[in-house]
Amino acid sequence: MPSDFPPGQAGIHARFRVDYPEFSLDVDLRLPGRGVTALFGQSGSGKTTCLRCMAGLAPVSDGYLDINGEVWLDSAARRAVPTHKRALGYVFQEASLFEHLDVLANLRYGMKRVPPALRRVDLEQATGLLGIGHLLARMPAGLSGGERQRVGIARALLTSPRLLLMDEPLAALDVQRKREILPYLERLHDELDIPVIYVSHSPDEVARLADHLVLLEQGRAVASGPLDALLTRLDLPMAMTDDASVVVTGEAAGFDPGYALLTLQLPGGRARLRFVHQAAPAGQRLRVVVHARDVSLALQQPREGSILNVLAVRVLEMAPAANPAHVMVRLDADGTPLLARITRYSRDRLALAPEMQAWAQIKAVSLLA
């Protein structure tokens, strides 16, 4: 089966059919050949099974896998590259380190799989990206959970993979450890040209890390597309969660040193956001996340108040939220998508309806790396 991607354009084509007594996976995915693709869904939706198929660890009754032009599986041609010959890195929920080896020896073990001439990630780069240079002489027993996971990720990178698979790498960590490790994962996203398939059931993780999103339900892909497009679809489950949010990319357009306020120009030209942050070069692209719970609506422009960001918006559609007392409202701010979660009482009091003009008051903006 030839690749379906245009000449010169990288991509991943993953088609798997897997049958178990009580579960089946049947997906046909066309994914970007770079950046982070998140597989999102409830437990039992098929996320890990899909990852195991990519790694060659699950029996596939019918399938095809092309990683940027390199075919690892083609059932029709009876071709299946064994797992140990697939240039992939696999990061599990808990790092499986060799307890009798120090961190440096664990990392060097990952490098042994790759001939020196084929290494695309070196030791200095991996330790720098994950911030573990000071841990090289430590034994695994002396590492925190977050440190162990960072070492495990670095070891996976040192195999110089063409594909990095990450199966809920933060699931075993407490909130503080997750906060510590997320910036390092964002650095991988920004600085390495390795496609990542990231399994998670955390909307916040997906919003911070992913470029592309695949939603799985009962072994089927119910939606696949750019993250910003799928996050605002009210017919999909992510918009119904307590952490429902949008991710917006803009450009730094000014800084007020007296108040430490950075201005972000949003796509479309007129809408801007301001938030407390350090200065950034003019024109630098930045990503921010805005949670639906932090957006309120008004019919008249608020003139006085403590909320910095008030944007003119158009109501696009509304849908019931997970909590029956609330509704989700999809908005357009001069081309920038937003979500608001408001009470049904507020909807009725404001008599909101599609195509109405309103004002969105954004209480909080979080900058992503």
Swiss-Prot record:
Protein topology in the membrane: Peripheral membrane protein
Known catalytic reactions: molybdate(out) + ATP + H2O = molybdate(in) + ADP + phosphate + H(+)
Class of enzymatic activity (EC top level): translocase
Location of the protein in the cell: Cell inner membrane
E.C. no: 7.3.2.5
One MF annotation (Gene Ontology) recorded for this entry: ABC-type molybdate transporter activity
Chaperone found in the keyword field: no
InterPro entries, A to Z: AAA+_ATPase, ABC_transporter-like_ATP-bd, ABC_transporter-like_CS, Mo/tungstate-bd_C_term_dom, ModC_ABC_ATP-bd, Molybdenum_import_ModC, Mop_domain, P-loop_NTPase
Binding sites annotated in the UniProt record for ATP: 41-48
Domain ABC transporter: 7-243
Pfam families, per the entry: ABC_tran, TOBE
GO cellular component, one term: plasma membrane
Gene3D superfamilies in the record: 2.40.50.100, P-loop containing nucleotide triphosphate hydrolases
Domain of life: Bacteria
Record domain Mop: where: 304-369
Keywords from the named record: ATP-binding, Cell inner membrane, Cell membrane, Membrane, Molybdenum, Nucleotide-binding, Translocase, Transport
Family: Belongs to the ABC transporter superfamily. Molybdate importer (TC 3.A.1.8) family.
Subunit structure comment from the entry: The complex is composed of two ATP-binding proteins (ModC), two transmembrane proteins (ModB) and a solute-binding protein (ModA).
Free-text function comment from the UniProt entry: Part of the ABC transporter complex ModABC involved in molybdenum import. Responsible for energy coupling to the transport system.
The protein's name: Molybdenum import ATP-binding protein ModC
Organism per entry: Bordetella pertussis (strain Tohama I / ATCC BAA-589 / NCTC 13251)
